[in-house]
Amino acid sequence: MAFRKENKVKSFTRIFISLASSDNILAQSSGEVLKPETINYRTYRPERDGLFCERIFGPIKDYECHCGKYKRIRYKGVVCDRCGVEVTEKRVRRERMGHIQLVVPVVHIWYFRSLPNKIGYLLGLSSKKLDAIIYYERFVVIQPGITDKKVCDLLSEEEYLEVLDGLPVENQRLDDINPDKFIAKMGGEAIYDLLSRLELDSLSYELRHKIDNDTSQQRKIDALKRLQVIESFRSSKNKNRPEWMVIGVIPVIPPELRPLIPLDGGRFAASDVNDLYRRVIIRNNRLKRLIDIDAPDVILRNEKRMLQEAVDSLFDNSRKSSAVKTDANRPLKSLSDSLKGKQGRFRQNLLGKRVDYSARSVIVVGPELKMHECGLPKGIAAELYKPFIIRKLMDRGVVKTVKSAKKLVDGRDPIIWDILEYVMKGHPVLLNRAPTLHRLSIQAFQPKLIEGKAIQLHPLSCTAFNADFDGDQMAVHLPLGNEAILEAQMLMLASHNILNPANGTPITIPSQDMVLGLFYITKMRRGAKGEGLKFYGTEEAIIAYNEGKVDIHAFVKVYVDDIDENGTPINHIIETSVGRVIVNGFVPKAVGFVNEELSKKSLRSVISDVIKTCGVSRTAQFLDDIKDLGYMMAFKGCLSFNLDNVIVPKEKETFVQEGYKEIEEILANYNMGIITYNERYNQIIDTWTHVNSRLSDALMKQLREDDQGFNPVFMMLESGARGSKEQIRQLSGMRGLMAKPQKSVMGGGQIIENPILSNFKEGLSVLEYFISTHGARKGLADTALKTADAGYLTRRLVDVSHNVIINEEDCGTLRGLIATELRKNEDVVVSLYERILGRVSVCDVQHPESRKIIVYAGEEISEDKALAIQNSSIERVEIRSVLTCESKKGVCVKCYGRNLATGSIVQIGEAVGVIAAQSIGEPGTQLTLRTFHVGGIASNIATESSVVSKYDGILEIDELRTVEVVDEINNRHLIVVSRLAEMRIIDTRTKIVLATYNIPYASKLFFNDRDEIKKGDLLFEWDAFNASIVSEVAGRFHLENVIENITYKNEYDEQTGLKEKVIIESRDKTKIPVIHILDENGEIRRIYNLPLGAHITKEEKDVIRVGEVLVKIPRTVGKTGDITGGLPRVTELFEARNPSNPAVVSEIDGEISFGKVKRGSREVIVTSKNGDYRTYLVSLSKQILVQENDYIRAGMPLSDGIIAPSDILAVNGPTAVQEYIVNEIQDVYRLQGVKINDKHFEVIVRQMMRKVEIIEAGDTKFVARQLVDRDEVSEENDHIWDKKVVVNVGDSSNVKQGQIITMRKLREENSILKRRDLRLIEVRDSIPATVMQILQGITRASLQTSSFISAASFQETAKVLNEAAIKGKVDKLVGMKENVICGRLIPAGTGLKEYDKIMVETTME
């Protein structure tokens, strides 16, 4: 028998998966397993022909046969004549397969138990019928012959025998190929015969015809599903046959992959797979015996069924209802289970391997280390660098053999320390802290030998690792190869990773004590020693300080070197302090003199400036210097606080009293019936929120003034070293409102009306303490749940985007996104500068006044250019974006723009997909699970109810309809009755829009269109607690269909004794409650619909004036808007889920009218100006936001609720939905104060929009409703563009009907036919496929990726693999996961193919 001598790894470029035929399995097998025995329990040697047989799988000892006749390597390759074992090494037992020859074929469980049911669709049988055939309950007709049965009819045994009795005797003697013979079988054999008789091509043609012509939607859908399975087989181009889903031979995996492990006491722990194989072999052998002795059919059938079940369990035990269990009642792990899940083959062994040359230990702080260093304990270092030390020991001739060198190292002989120092030079180590949430969780450091057993970590790299020194552990890894060492030094060294890849701001930034020290010495105070002194230079100032002549905080004048706005060096006198002079001694000259208090915020901008002007290495040095200075000064300043530093504001008592006064008024109003229960609740919450924020402001003011701002508590807060405003407010203000415990998760977080008025300094009462414990505990529980959720989000994000790599310089697209600044009301949330910085412009950007070009098309927008654009009156810039990039693979440099981690334009090969996923996933743990923070304190924002102008200017109002109202004191104002009204404030001089507002329905408006306004004018106000319906006409009030206890109920308030009519959902769907406004003659002038939960404020026959409120609809109680907060919202958006109560959205512009009521829904009809109309059904339980005759725009909601992303895509197109998703997710992160650059979200959203759905397949290879890559469709459409489809073959024998042929072939064929005077071929033009863009959630997008290996390692492993096998998929190994799994270099960074081709040569002088 031949065997491989060299163990050379074959290089491969793609991996192909398909069904295995019996011949394939036999070709790979080394022999048949005949016995169920594993090993002999007396001799512990494998049994012959058993599951561990040495003859089949190879010897268990190197170069030794079973019987011992041949031993030693010299017999290598000899097959023993006594025991039949080949003499070779024992590792072949890891790769040699065996097989089991089954007596009857069985059906593979994957193909009839997983959905969609492949065999069922191919044969057109339901799962139930299929099970009846496979498990030997029914016969199935395979060939009807001369009977009246049809193919695939099921027969019970009686019916089968009846049919046989009715047939002439000779029928059964006919040959199977004879179409007259009646054949019916059951079990695997029947399925095998049926599948092998399928004609896929003609079946495909029939189904396509049926889809085109069938009238019933359901039949169409069924045919489509069948067609998809059939097309899968056809697309695998004869590599797959349907009958291979039935197996006659089962492969046996190598014994070392299912080992027997001896335990103490002579017992064995066997792998579960062995048990499953044993059951198959036992049943198979029993069946053989029964057939040999001609057992009756009933017994045979039962045994065959048991064999089918045994094979099912072997392949996939978890899919069966009656899984095979062990004695301990645990289901056995089958072959499928060993691939699935976190513990499966993919994720446990292929994507995450344990590696050699690694160590882990506790970390401690190393304040005297340099930025690029870490302290490595001697014990760890000696072990890690062992081979290098041994080599050096031998080179230097200290020892002769490896063994003795090993002894020296293990004995920690003093001689090895010098050698270790030498070996470690220029050989960095990698430090990693779990959880590795982003790429900065693994960084390279140059190790320094230290005593002790803990690793020392530089304090500035803690932020990146998210490490603290309360017992965290870190792992050390050693890069071995020269390339690896070089990459660690050039790319991963900690001093090179100063910027955060998520947003480009410095991440190695002093924190805690360092900040406190720097803040302390750059703070100035009046009246300090030496105030007003003048120094001619910085040295003199420092000498004076050292001599004790001047205080470090004193205001002094110093002559310093500085830099003006244009960056030219100047010298001038400035007022500063000695502390700031000392700090500036370390600041690079090119940055100028930093004359400000250094808090965490200002330090960040100083460090950014240093990086921009001086580069990374100088920044690293600067960071080290200010780290040392910060620690020194925190120590010198003795900054700790005592109880007296925690100041309780003087005004607290008065604020609280005022709060109580307001609440008395609210309760009085409530008791008089002026306001409803909900309004009372909302107003009370509002009052306390207001008191709390006033108290916070007073507290901050007082702390700031205390001891000239040198109050230690205030300094810790102000510098950003420790604590937050919220925490200080609780220490010395009041704890404020608390959240109610939720009975269920959906219970909604209500707020307890009575706030905790005490603070921690005064101490809480027992009741207050009890209320606050709830919040504290909930916080801990939430954190634990949140971590898992955030980790799973990151995993899905990486999976969807791991193959987005920068692959080319420029894709040449002409498209881009319009970037504008983002505003909420009039506050700028994100400036235009931030949005365009580091992007590439699509077209030339001209300055509007000077007409000078600021940025050319295709040029990166740098800081100064972005600033120039921001300062000009340009409002929008078209920038290149990943979303519009047209690269076939990955994205291009120009569309991505700047790499935030380096601050320069991105390089080809950068793995931007993974970086995006990490940047979004890493802050995930900081997002809230719900809407409350700080020990359960309710952060309910005081509700706004009016808009005051912040600018002078002119008003522009669009889409406005108003009615004029005169109130009791004869003041006139306008009430807005349109839903689309938008107000803009325009600068009178430059005509720039300063602010934009949407005016809510039913607002009071105080100005008209084109009015001039001044800063501080009240523009409009509205009722924040109620939505209302306003009458647009005067007349009499009349209620229609408002019937007690059917469409409304009286809500009786015990405290006030007042009744209110509240609309409820009626059982009788024909009765729709409406308000009619009647004129004098009783004619209806207007109709208003009443939504659920509406409170009717008027009585029957009341006289109604224009602009009066008819109905109030209370907004939900005390919830901060109707928002899903934090992580769940992010997940909802990334998964592109439709919200639970989606709004109904209009697809066209038009006027509203109402139709009939159908099945609990109201018809809303939108009619456009050209007469085109759409009808929408809005459920009666929803509030309809529009009234009769309103004019609305496409994309506007007709009912309340959140607009679903799929609607935005359908109505406003892909760009709108992309922007919507990016902005919505950004909102969640911004709320938590997390800054992430837009381009990361764009990368993910691009991956969500990769696929299109085929609407009409035309003449392409696709099937309707199939999801296909956009590029694939355009390729296929281009391919059939100028081809023809044969309609009539004429007299030609070379073409078939429906075949696609080229014009050339058509001309050739027809000219031949013409010469012979035969009928010509008739053709029509080919029809390309039409598609619709779809939006996929990240999970679906990951599973739909073109690489089946990547999809299988993500989720639903079995399903992904069995669909890939049927299609005969090829994995071209383009993404990262596939390459990691195959053990190759990833195709990104330095592993990119382009970099392999680089030749290095020396230039001759």
From Swiss-Prot:
Broad enzyme group: transferase
Keywords from the UniProt entry: DNA-directed RNA polymerase, Magnesium, Metal-binding, Nucleotidyltransferase, Transcription, Transferase, Zinc
Binding site for Zn(2+) 2: C811, C885, C892, C895
Catalyzed reaction equations: RNA(n) + a ribonucleoside 5'-triphosphate = RNA(n+1) + diphosphate
Residues reported to bind Zn(2+) 1: C65, C67, C80, C83
Binding site for Mg(2+): D468, D470, D472
Keyword Ubl conjugation: no
EC number(s) recorded for this UniProt protein: 2.7.7.6
Superkingdom as given in the UniProt entry: Bacteria
Pfam families, per database record: RNA_pol_Rpb1_1, RNA_pol_Rpb1_2, RNA_pol_Rpb1_3, RNA_pol_Rpb1_4, RNA_pol_Rpb1_5
Cofactor info, note text: Binds 1 Mg(2+) ion per subunit.
GO biological process, one term: DNA-templated transcription
GO MF annotation terms: DNA binding; DNA-directed RNA polymerase activity; magnesium ion binding; zinc ion binding
GO cellular component: DNA-directed RNA polymerase complex
Keyword Nucleotidyltransferase: yes
Segment forming the signal sequence: none
Cofactor(s) this protein requires: Mg(2+); Zn(2+)
Protein function: DNA-dependent RNA polymerase catalyzes the transcription of DNA into RNA using the four ribonucleoside triphosphates as substrates.
Family: Belongs to the RNA polymerase beta' chain family.
Quaternary assembly: The RNAP catalytic core consists of 2 alpha, 1 beta, 1 beta' and 1 omega subunit. When a sigma factor is associated with the core the holoenzyme is formed, which can initiate transcription.
UniProt xrefs under NCBIfam families: rpoC_TIGR
PANTHER family per UniProt: DNA-DIRECTED RNA POLYMERASE, DNA-DIRECTED RNA POLYMERASE SUBUNIT BETA
Designated name of the protein: DNA-directed RNA polymerase subunit beta'
Protein species of origin: Azobacteroides pseudotrichonymphae genomovar. CFP2
Lineage, top ranks: Bacteria, Pseudomonadati, Bacteroidota, Bacteroidia, Bacteroidales
Gene field: rpoC
